Regions:
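Membrane-proximal envelope and lipid/glycan-remodeling enzymes
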Residues: 1-388
């Protein structure tokens, strides 16, 4: 990638598969497949609530009586709605329509997004300057040392949103480093928004740079903004049909079973009061001791990113002076703002899963700074990330 974000995109072909690429792709497929099989064996097969909602959608309504009394459900005059985004439901529709693989759909859907996201980590690393074996190390970190693996194998519609967003943001960043077609960039951000609305904030810095660098600025802005506008309108309609307001996502009025989450929500769904606890979960939360085997356990609300994915620290190697690095840092920071203002934190998780909203930008920074690697320290951090 050219260090100047305003420079014209390169027409030079970047991605040519070689033996190492194929072996990496095969390794990802095997690891993710085996991990999913273990998850299925350990958790057994259950019908996901998102699959139930998909069946209701095919019947012409958004509510489902079976949702009553479950977490993140909204009761509107005796009709029960699941307070999740549209892209957490839509992939279930084919399974609901054909009535096949009930209970397995959630695992297969997560893999369908998670595996390609892991595969694309390699071209992402190369697009932002990683060369030779270093690109494979970075790709291995993304595939096995980030929370992408965790979110891809447990068959959970909450985690699915992160896989969807991670994949589309990865494609977005690769496209930005290459041809920078406004319609493609806008489409990727639009899809990411439908999965994780927080990620739409990345459109601000990238959109400004795109418009600034183009002679056809108005046309570029329209091509970038149209798919984003359609996605926002669709999400608003989706909320209005369920809750009577395009701005009501349901999380402010949904049913909660955990008193601590209810107490946090009382402070505001988005509030500065949430920042200290979210920072603690994201950066400082440590394993807790047990008096018996395995002697350590983790807080179900989160675990420090510095323990789970310490290789993200190498994003600092990119520095802050390079204009490309500045753009990526700004995007990551903007996306992180609502993450740390939000009350939820992400219950029943390993690590701090909301960090996946801005992780793709940090991965690009890791690759951008890879020319400054010493060697073993960075590989050690990646090894710890994978092992954790």
């Amino acid at each position: 990638m050219k260090s100047d974000p305003a420079a014209a995109p390169s027409a030079e072909p970047r991605y040519r598969l070689n033996r190492g690429d194929l072996l990496f792709g095969l390794a990802v497929l095997v690891v993710y497949g085996v991990a999913t099989a273990i998850a299925i064996f350990g958790r057994h097969v259950i019908v996901d609530r998102a699959e139930t909602v998909a069946e209701s959608l095919l019947a012409g309504h958004f509510d489902a009586a079976s949702l009553k009394g479950t977490v993140d459900t909204v009761d509107i005059n005796g009709h029960y709605y699941l307070a999740v985004g549209p892209l957490q439901i839509i992939p279930y529709l084919p399974f609901a329509y054909f009535h096949v693989l009930r209970g397995l759909a959630s695992y297969l859907i997560a893999l369908a997004f998670g595996v390609p996201a892991a595969w694309l980590a390699l071209p992402l690393a190369r697009a932002y300057g990683a060369r030779g074996k270093t690109a494979y190390w970075i790709a291995a970190f993304v595939a096995g040392g980030s929370l992408l693996l965790y979110c891809s194998v447990f068959g959970n519609f909450y985690l699915l949103a992160h896989c969807e967003s991670f994949l589309t943001l990865t494609v977005f960043l690769i496209e930005w480093a290459d041809r920078r077609r406004p319609a493609v960039l806008g489409s990727m951000l639009a899809i990411s928004f439908l999965a994780r609305p927080t990620t739409i904030l990345a459109a601000i810095p990238f959109g400004l740079v795109l418009v600034w660098q183009r002679r056809d600025a108005v046309l570029a802005a329209l091509q970038l903004g149209l798919p984003i506008g359609i996605a926002i309108a669709f999400y608003g309609w989706y909320n209005w049909v369920r809750f009577g307001s395009p701005l009501e996502t349901g999380y402010a009025i949904s049913y909660l079973t955990d008193p601590s989450l209810e107490a946090r929500r009382q402070l505001g769904v988005f509030s500065l009061s949430q920042v200290p606890e979210n920072l603690r979960l994201a950066l400082l939360a440590l394993p807790e001791g047990l008096g018996h085997f395995p002697y350590l356990t983790v807080d179900r609300f989160g675990l420090s990113m510095l323990l789970v994915s310490p290789a993200l620290l190498t994003s600092l190697w990119a520095g802050f002076r390079d204009r490309a690095a500045q753009l990526l840092w700004i995007a990551a920071a903007l996306v992180a703002v609502p993450v740390f203002l939000y009350y939820g934190g992400g219950a029943d998780q390993y690590g701090f899963r909301y960090s996946l909203d801005f992780t793709p930008f940090l991965v690009a920074l890791v690759a951008l700074g890879s020319s400054r690697w010493k060697g073993w320290p960075e590989r050690l951090l990646i090894g710890i990330s994978v092992a954790s």
